[in-house]
């Protein structure tokens, strides 16, 4: 997520957004492009400046990008954004430490929406929140997506959230993309052994239905110094000598369903 926004410089490859390679943009071009690309951070406690009020935090991108220079108009925009994310106007001059996690994350969402972006990278946006608040934030984000035509890149380890939220799912293991498909297709036909193990861990809310849990064994390969071959080979129950020596490529096994696994060849 941070590489897409170039908060961390990618070491190789391309990041194509709106037909343009983000990696080739200079500082000034990137500054303009970031109006269309925003980020909602994982931790609502660490991502907000404790020295600034709610209004100052939400107004900051508008000031930095010089989108609204008139202070009164900027404050009107802040109030509008607060209303959109469900924050009461009376909170406008409060500080982050005076608010709970749910309200803090709403501030982060309002800040991300300030410049009317096309894309928002959501880095585990509910994982640090109480379970009772998670659903509220997810429903808010879904409503905003429908109202504003937003595109989310939603990074999470919670597969129940993914099933509820995503149109398309990309599964990664140690930095490698191993399976990608529309949400319904991936949940119905998980193909990569790691994806199958992930989905087997989701509880089934039924006494009649049971799902066999796949327990992975073996040591996790170092992501810094990975061994040759497939990065999942050390834990895969179906791994062959080829898996341990040759890295599989991501390929399409059926329309819109991509898998990086030697075992899918010929399917």
Protein language model features and the residues they cover:
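Conserved ABC transporter NBD signature motif
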Residues: 13-21, 33
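P-loop NTP-binding/switch modules centered on Walker-like glycine-rich loops
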Residues: 121, 125-129, 133-211
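Short catalytic/signature loops enriched in Gly
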Residues: 182-267
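Conserved ABC ATPase "signature" region
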Residues: 21, 66, 72-90, 196-200
């Amino acid at each position: 997520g941070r590489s897409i926004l170039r908060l961390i410089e990618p070491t190789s490859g391309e990041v194509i957004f709106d037909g343009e390679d983000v990696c080739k943009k200079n500082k000034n071009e990137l500054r303009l492009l970031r109006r269309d690309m925003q980020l909602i951070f994982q931790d609502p406690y660490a991502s907000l400046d404790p020295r600034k009020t709610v209004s100052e935090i939400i107004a900051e991108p508008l000031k930095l990008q010089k989108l609204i220079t008139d202070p009164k108009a900027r404050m009107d925009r802040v109030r509008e954004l607060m209303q959109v994310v469900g924050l009461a106007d009376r909170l406008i001059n409060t500080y982050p430490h005076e608010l709970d996690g749910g309200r803090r994350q709403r501030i982060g969402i309002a800040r991300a929406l300030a410049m009317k972006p096309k894309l928002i990278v959501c880095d585990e946006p509910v994982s640090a929140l109480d379970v009772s608040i998670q659903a509220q934030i997810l429903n808010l984000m879904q409503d905003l997506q429908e109202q504003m035509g937003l595109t989310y890149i939603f990074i999470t380890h919670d597969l129940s959230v993914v099933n509820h939220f995503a149109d398309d799912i990309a599964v990664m293991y140690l930095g490698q993309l191993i399976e990608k498909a529309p949400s319904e297709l991936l949940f119905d036909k998980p193909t990569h052994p790691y994806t199958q193990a992930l989905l087997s861990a989701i509880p089934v809310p039924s006494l009649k239905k049971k799902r066999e849990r796949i327990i992975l064994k073996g040591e996790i390969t170092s992501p810094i110094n990975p061994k040759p071959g497939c990065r999942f080979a050390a834990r895969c129950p179906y791994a062959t000598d080829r898996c341990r020596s040759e890295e599989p490529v991501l390929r399409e096994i059926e329309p819109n369903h991509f898998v990086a696994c030697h075992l899918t060849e010929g399917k």
